């Protein structure tokens, strides 16, 4: 059987434009910025929160619910200030379940990021511990992902604070697209 050379050549030529577009797309993708994340690093430091009542405490069964407006200064990996809203449920046995969210602003003003946390505490000894996550950064915190824990102790009123405290945080920090 005789092969038609002209027919095979046209078939090859008909596939060249598609192959060209695939090749062009592959080359163009090499010029795009990498979507690879950096290596995680440690995050640690201290904080001093100042709690003030957002409203009067409410009683729900045996539990007392308190909403706090919190301002905090932070040192260490995150040096700056935070504005937070925290909801505490104080149970009849003195244990506390706490949840909060806020925004951190860098001391130099280079950026901000949002964070949330949840944890537990004790109205008996004033201790608190929680797990936090942060992200949605701006400026120097664009692409930030952070996660860790904090622990602290609360004391009574101090200056402009209905409740004051101090503590430490530790965790990981990662910048990724």
State what each model feature region is.
Residues 1-14:
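N-terminal secretory signal peptides that target proteins for export/translocation
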């Amino acid at each position: 059987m005789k092969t038609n050379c002209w027919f095979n050549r046209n078939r090859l030529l008909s596939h060249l434009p598609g192959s060209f577009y695939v090749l062009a797309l592959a080359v163009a993708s090499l010029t795009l910025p990498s979507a690879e994340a950096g290596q995680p690093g440690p995050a640690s430091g201290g904080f001093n929160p100042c709690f003030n009542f957002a409203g009067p405490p409410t009683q729900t069964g045996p539990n007392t619910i308190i909403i706090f407006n919190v301002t905090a200064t932070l040192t260490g990996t995150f040096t700056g200030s935070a504005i937070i809203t925290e909801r505490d449920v104080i149970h009849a046995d003195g244990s506390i379940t706490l949840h909060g969210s806020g925004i951190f602003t860098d001391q130099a003003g280079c950026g901000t990021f949002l964070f949330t946390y949840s944890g537990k505490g004790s109205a008996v000894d004033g201790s608190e511990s929680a797990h936090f996550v942060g992200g949605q950064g701006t400026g120097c915190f664009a692409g930030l992902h952070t996660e860790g824990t904090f622990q602290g102790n609360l004391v009574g009123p101090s200056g402009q604070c209905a409740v004051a405290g101090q503590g430490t945080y530790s965790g990981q920090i990662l910048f990724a697209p």
